[in-house]
Amino acid sequence: MASRHYSAKNTTKKIRNIGIIAHIDAGKTTTTERILYLSGTIKHLGNVDEGDTTMDFLPAERERGITIASAATSFNWNNHTVNLIDTPGHADFTFEVIRSIRVLDGAVCILDGVAGVEAQTEKVWKQASEMGIPKIAFVNKMDRAGAGFGRTVKEIVSKLRTRVALLTVPVFSKSSDQVFEGVVDILNGCVITWTTGGDGKQTVVVPVSEASAEVQEEYQKARTALVETLTELDEELVEKFLESEDYMQITTEDIKRALRTATINNDIVPVLCGASFRNIGVQPLMDAVVDFLPSPAERPPTDALIAKSYTGGKKSKVIPERAITLDDSMKNLCCALCFKVVQDPQKGTLVYVRVYKGELKQNSVLYNTTSGTKDRVSRLLKVHADTTSEVTSITEGNIGVILGSQGLATGDTIVCHSIKKDGVMKLPPDNRLIQLKPIAVPPPVFFVRIDPASIGDTRPMNEALELLLREDPSLNVSFDDETNQTTLSGMGELHLEIAQNRLIEDFKANIVIGPIIISYKETLNEPTKSITKTVEPEPGAVSTVRLRLEPITEMDEACENENVIDHEQNTVSFPYELSDADLESVGEGNQRISFERDTKELTPEIMEECFRVGSIPPLVSCGPVCRLPLRSVRVVIEAWHIAQHINNTASLKTATRLAIMEALSTANATLMEPIMNVYVSVNEADIGLVVKDLSGSRNGQIVSIMDPSQLNEGDIHSEEYVAMATNTYVPADYTMYLSKHQDQTRTQQSVVHARVPLREMVGYLKTLRSMTQGRGSFTMEVDQYEAVTPDKIQPIVDSIFA
């Protein structure tokens, strides 16, 4: 494969890193296929239903017709390099969406013109907004009966809470069935129509002045509304307007400048429409991506951390982490984030990276600041789904792939010297501690047991699991030494199903997989007695700790010097300085321990790390009921002692671990289970069945039944955007009457909000589809963990040990 450089025109200002986000089935992958085809990147149009799309290249994706992994592709549009990521829409793959959004500079949100703003649309929109990602909206499927462009635009304003700028509005044929055939381009003052049944390349462009009177009137309304909205955000445009006092006299160039600024500042969202499956409206969408979404140079400086470090010797101390931004003062630094790892059956390990600073060159020596290891870049690629082209470097702001590295995992930060290929160790020491803010992994709630089919299959199984975890850190693998069982946990049923398929089909692991099990936890019913443990690894090197465990309730206030141990809401509190009474009682029986050392060597930060690290192992795997992880437990360090000549805390960590294990061995504990907030969208006719099922056989509690527009009722900001939506210009939805039944079905949907134990939601999607003839949908998220009722404990224990 020939290597090649990208030409000088591909500077940072000419780069667009964008992602496609949406609810499942809104048309993300289909839109991407059309973009690739119209840009000349592919020669054949793929079809999701036929399983031959370019971006959905995993076998499981083509089989199910859904996107699972975020495929990345690069192409050219209007003399710009566009790096595009097609993300999943299914809620089980939220982490895949989050880690993709992390590396974007802009996003295109695809909406179904019939369904409007859906549950997952709101979720991914919120995720992008929290990261400050500018967005464009594309109302898709305008060729479908019941599609409502105006209605969907108003939902964008009210539900997604944003101003909008309409750049295209739909055009329909004058026949009785009013076929969607094109758009009015508001910026350029023309009507664009596409040949029916064509591939999207054949268009007819007519000036608005030559269009019908109705189209001319709609164009004037839309352009006036666009300029009027922008004058609320741009003072320079106000001055232009005051010169003529006519919105129609504002030039296209002035509108584009103001709109670009407002979009990049997240003050407004450009909105376009089309029908990707019919190849209509895609070119104006891509023109808008280039014209209005930011380049990497127009995004805020990249935030990073200088990681916590330690100085050695007798005066050892912790240097706390500190926040920084990557700027021009960091000479010769190349810094990149590994945001995705894929095991390709032909090419091997593909590590997708976004370069935030400097230039990543072939054959450079890398330093992985996450793991503290070095590696070398052998080959670099630009990727188009499952095809690649080799490059000699990846420039600042660009996205590419490192081929063949075995030491990199999703979320790792890598640094190297931008000029000297082996100069990484010549960078300032702080540069080798830089960590781009890690991608937060949500805690998993489902798990399955995985066993090798035979003893000889154990090693291949473990190797396959290691590869899988490098790809997807939202999966978690744990091993129980006592039962010799391996457990794989994930975000949902589909998530684990896909992971199992990857292990068997792609990694050829010969394994036996158990049924889906819920992620139960354990907690204490009451405090334990105090336990004292002494460790003496060598004569005179005594470390002693006295501690107790107690449950944390919602009413508890944090203790002094209390520190969070893990994401299970476990904490540890300890006294940094001990009183004489504490010291006299540290020992057991007649033993008295004196405390005479100079504590300057053992700073509060070092002691916090000591007790936290010592607490983690037993809290993860020593639950007294089922050896499950503990939750909402406070480790109270009552007293501690380290012999004066010891300069580290290793033995005290051991004493802490052993003391917690002993305390747990006789603790009064119970099980906790995840309680989910479940939101079920159903037609009014199906509400009775759904409510009966949730509150009856599934032991759920119905919180409310409401219209979707009421979900944020009472929120002053929500009310503000509802009012804004009412006053937002939109064209009339002439085609909605063509599907009165479908529109009625949609507008009469309600949302049932219930709190349901997760164990009762396993397999719920199939039941819901059966009850609603396939029309119902639901989302759920963890509300909190609650104690299992006594009558349910033994059946759950039996199922865990089955």
Curated annotation (Swiss-Prot):
Residues 13-297 form the tr-type G domain. It comes from the Eukaryota. SMART domains: EFG_C. GTP binds at residues 22-29, 86-90, 140-143. Keywords: GTP-binding, Mitochondrion, Nucleotide-binding, Protein biosynthesis. GO terms for molecular function: GTP binding; GTPase activity. GO terms for biological process: mitochondrial translation; ribosome disassembly. InterPro entries: EF-G-like_DII, EFG2, EFG_II, EFG_III, EFG_III/V, EFG_V, EFG_V-like, G_TR_CS. GO terms for cellular component: mitochondrion. This protein may be expected to contain an N-terminal transit peptide but none has been predicted. Belongs to the TRAFAC class translation factor GTPase superfamily. Classic translation factor GTPase family. EF-G/EF-2 subfamily. This is Ribosome-releasing factor 2, mitochondrial.
